[in-house]
C-alpha cells in the first residue's frame, strides 16, 4: 500500500468524527465477555501466536492445508467465543426481565386482593422469545466447541452429543483421551439441549416440534412465581430452584466451566504432543 494512502487512512480512522461513529456503534451493537470468561480464548490465542506453532506454520504455507489453519483459529476465537457471548447476552436479558417483572409487580398490593387464591397472568412472549434464543444459542455453542476441537485432527465434525464417541476414532490418543474424559464429565449436565433416543431435548422441541414457554406467571400469598415452561419450574423443581434465573445461572456456570476446561486441555494436550513429536 502506498505510504501516503496509509497515512491518510490512519488519520481518518483516528479522526474524532470517525471515533465518534465507532463509539456510537459499540454502545448500541457491541457486547463483550467478562475478563474471566475471555481467559480461555486469550490462552488459545497466546498459544497460536507466541510463537506460532510449527504445525500451524506448515498449514499456512500449504495451499491444500491452509483452510485448516482458518478453521483451527476461527473455530475457537470467533465461532466459539462469539457464541458463548451470545448465550451470555440472552442469559443477562432473561435475568433483567425477571428482575423488572418482579420489581414492577411488587409495587401493587396484590396479596391483599387475592387472599388464598392464585392467579395466572398471560402474555410473556418477550420472556419466551429470549428463553428460546438462549436454548438455541446454548446448543449451538456446544456444537461449535465440538467442531473447533476436531479441527486439529483435520476433521469436520460438529455434534457435541456424539463428540466422545467420535474422538475415540482419532489420533493421537494423547490429545483425544483427556478430551473424552472431559466430555464424559460434562455431557450429563447438558441433557436439556441434547436429545437421546425418544427423549426430545428442549432445543429439538423448539426447533422442530412446538412452542416452548419460559413459564407462566403465578401470583399468590407466597408472591411471584414463574411456573412450568421449558424448565418445568415450581416448588417441586428437582434442583430446589423456584426462579428461572436460578436454573439458568446453573446452566451458564456449567457451560462456561466446560468451555474453559476443554479449551485449556485442548491447548495443553496439543502443546505436549508437539513437543513429543520433535
Describe the role of every protein-language-model region.
Residues 1-96, 110-135, 146-278:
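Acidic, Ser/Thr/Gly/Pro-rich intrinsically disordered interaction regions
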Residues 101-104, 108-113:
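Mixed-charge, low-complexity intrinsically disordered segments
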